[in-house]
Curated annotation (Swiss-Prot):
Organism from which the protein derives: Francisella philomiragia subsp. philomiragia (strain ATCC 25017 / CCUG 19701 / FSC 153 / O#319-036)
UniProt-listed InterPro entries: Ribosomal_uL4, Ribosomal_uL4-like, Ribosomal_uL4_dom_sf
Superkingdom of this protein's organism: Bacteria
Identification of the protein by name: Large ribosomal subunit protein uL4
Lineage of producing organism: Bacteria, Pseudomonadati, Pseudomonadota, Gammaproteobacteria, Thiotrichales
Described function: One of the primary rRNA binding proteins, this protein initially binds near the 5'-end of the 23S rRNA. It is important during the early stages of 50S assembly. It makes multiple contacts with different domains of the 23S rRNA in the assembled 50S subunit and ribosome. Forms part of the polypeptide exit tunnel.
Length: 207
């Protein structure tokens, strides 16, 4: 199948052939949801830790005798009902990682890319280069392409500091190379702009 190519000025500039297996796959919402949730869960640190009554410092002695005081019986001042006591159901470090095999992951990415094409939210440009880090110049490119809330995906060799510096101060605009794309970044933006080189690298990885 072919996708239209636009110049950075927004004009038609030809077509590029792409693999139907990558850009015309069936939409699988449940798979996308599962992979996105797993990806975001894997990003959690899971390092939160609290102390139970047995781990809190102090509280070795019985605070008062068992009977005769009129007070409720107590065996330690580190009980959860006391100030400075332990936590009843203390949080412990845990891993939130979920298993997602390569076939599921690549299937979700293909499904997202294909839906971007079908919904006319994907744009392909010849290349994307800036000689100097100028936010104003990058803003002109974004406006010329007529896209908002957009992720620019470039080839590994095309990505440089100029692109990063030029785009980082623009609201709802981001730039990454083809290696860094993931299901979350693809679904978080309304539009995605790919360079020809990025398309080629993604196909090599997914086909």
């Amino acid at each position: 199948m072919d996708l239209n190519i636009k110049s950075l000025a927004g004009a038609e500039a030809g077509v590029v052939g792409v693999a139907e297996g990558v850009f015309a796959a069936d939409y699988n919402e449940s798979l996308i949801h599962q992979v996105v949730v797993a990806y975001m869960a894997g990003a959690r640190q899971g390092t939160k830790a609290q102390k139970t009554r047995s781990e809190v410092s102090g509280g070795g002695a019985k605070p008062w005798r068992q009977k005769g005081t009129g007070r409720a019986r107590a065996g330690t001042i580190r009980s959860p009902i006391f100030r400075k006591g332990g936590v009843t159901f203390a949080a412990k470090p845990k891993s939130y990682k979920q298993k997602v095999n390569r076939k599921m992951y690549s299937g979700a990415v293909k499904s997202i890319l294909s839906e971007l094409v079908r919904s006319d939210r994907m744009t392909v440009v010849e290349s994307l280069r800036l000689e100097t880090p100028k936010t104003k110049e990058f803003k002109v490119i974004v406006d010329s392409l007529g896209v908002k809330d957009v992720l620019f995906v470039v080839g590994v060799e095309e990505f440089n500091e100029n692109l990063y510096l030029s785009s980082r101060n623009l609201k709802n605009v981001a730039v990454c190379d083809s290696v860094e794309i993931n299901p979350v970044s693809l679904v978080c933006f309304e539009n995605v702009v790919f360079t020809k080189q990025a398309i080629k690298e993604i196909e090599e990885k997914l086909v």
